[in-house]
Amino acid sequence: IGSGAYTENSMVMGTAEGGLKIMLYNVNAIDIDNPYIDSDNPYQDKSNPNKDLNYYFFHTMHHEFAHILCQKKSFPTDFNLISASTYKSTDWINVKDADAPKDGFVSGYASGEANEDFVEIYSIYVTHTASAWAKILHDGTVWTKDSTGKEVATDTKGTDAILEKFKIVEDYLKNSWNIDID
């Protein structure tokens, strides 16, 4: 769809319907003469007028594709329990992507509810570099400096939750769809 779609408080980048169809929105924003792709930065600057094809389109395609997979075959319900007490429901819009890992999420949007959390893990992992994924995991840990100035992990709950959920995503893809996420 050429134009954007909006809810009362956010822009809709894509939808997945009936286990068959994916719709992408705002494709008129693509600058075909000057494509911009950033797979190294896991925290997109959404104020940048140059639309990052990775964030706005490739990530969205994979995000919606993962919804299609989950509409066809449900993922294990154990996933829902890992962050059950920390989902933000409608307040996810106020969670900055760079702050989300400390709470165990790969993006602010992932903090909304389990289905979005699951597909965000998949879509961010497959559309970003290994160093971008490592940054998310690093940012999921609270770090302090010891007396020598060396970083010391003081709280790994965020990283631990992301890795636990990632393992479920990885196993689901392998066991349900014979997809190796790597």
Where do the model's predicted regions map?
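Active-site-flanking segments in enzyme catalytic domains
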Residues: 3-9, 13-182
